[in-house]
A protein has these predicted regions:
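Short strand-turn-strand beta-turns centered on an Asx-Gly dipeptide
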Residues: 50-51
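N-terminal auxiliary segments of SAM/dcSAM-dependent transferases
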Residues: 1-46
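The AdoMet/dcAdoMet-binding core of the Class I SAM-like
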Residues: 1-6, 10, 30, 43, ...
């Protein structure tokens, strides 16, 4: 069944984004927050925490590259890394041999 749901996110008084939801893939509440995974028309799968967009298939690389590359570039040989948060798994660097995740929110892993 097609969804008539739109996700709207406002940023200040003059800027916002709207996403057409094709299907709700998961919706639940955890100990810490609400967690939703939806299929959108233009951005693919989207993860929302408490109704706020965390990451989308279309542009996740922008988010993950920004938070991963700086620490990876300052270390001469990043083989073993600890990732705090990052339950979606997108931060793990290609150069890493072993990655350890510390994620308190089981619902987003």
């Amino acid at each position: 069944m097609k969804s008539h749901l739109w996700i709207e996110e406002k940023h200040g008084d003059f800027l916002g984004m709207a996403y057409k939801v094709e299907e709700v893939l998961f919706s639940g509440k955890s100990k810490f927050q609400s967690v939703d995974v939806v299929q959108t028309k233009g951005h693919g799968k989207m993860l929302l925490n408490d109704g706020l967009v965390m990451v989308t298939e279309r542009d996740e690389f922008v988010y993950h590259d920004m938070i991963a590359h700086v620490p990876l570039f300052v270390h001469p040989s990043p083989k073993n890394v600890l990732i705090i948060g990052g339950g979606d798994g997108g931060v793990r660097g290609v150069s890493c041999v072993r990655a350890f995740f510390l994620q308190c929110e089981r619902a987003v892993v």
